[in-house]
Design a protein with these regions (language model features):
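Non-catalytic, surface beta->alpha helical segment in thiol-disulfide oxidoreductase systems
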Residues: 72, 78-110
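Conserved redox-active cysteine motifs that mediate thiol-disulfide chemistry
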Residues: 25-39
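Conserved helix-turn-beta segment immediately C-terminal to the redox Cys motif
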Residues: 18-20, 37-56
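Acidic phosphotransfer microenvironment of two-component signaling modules
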Residues: 8-11, 62-63, 95
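A short beta-strand-turn-helix
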Residues: 3-20
Length: 111
């Protein structure tokens, strides 16, 4: 899963992507973020070629966090055609995240 480190990279990888993009807004010090991370990593493999997955460290990318109103973490957002189409804050199970993705992009994982 790709780590976004600049606003320019976010534009390229997320806003200009042909695929829907799942964005994990997180921070190093955040316990719930660390709890969600393995599930997000596994799902990124299941959805490859259908959904792009990226991580944004809110401490290193404060401007992006402010722009997208990230007030609590983890926040899991889905972007499509350069716009946020779904956003959910808080830790969630792998199954909950899978349901969230399927509901918002109308696709099933190949796994």
């Amino acid at each position: 899963m790709k780590e976004i480190t600049t606003t320019q990279q976010f534009e390229q990888e997320v806003l200009n992507s042909a695929n829907p993009v799942f964005v994990d807004f997180w921070a190093e010090w955040c316990g719930p973020c660390k709890a969600v991370s393995p599930a997000v990593e596994e799902l990124s493999g299941e959805y490859k070629d259908k959904v792009d997955f990226v991580k944004v460290n809110v401490d290193q990318n404060n401007e992006l966090a402010q722009k997208y109103n990230i007030f609590s973490i983890p926040t899991l957002a889905i972007f499509k055609d350069g716009k946020v189409i779904a956003q959910s804050a808080g830790a969630a199970s792998k199954e909950s995240i899978r349901t969230y993705i399927n509901k918002n992009i109308q696709t099933e994982a190949s796994a």
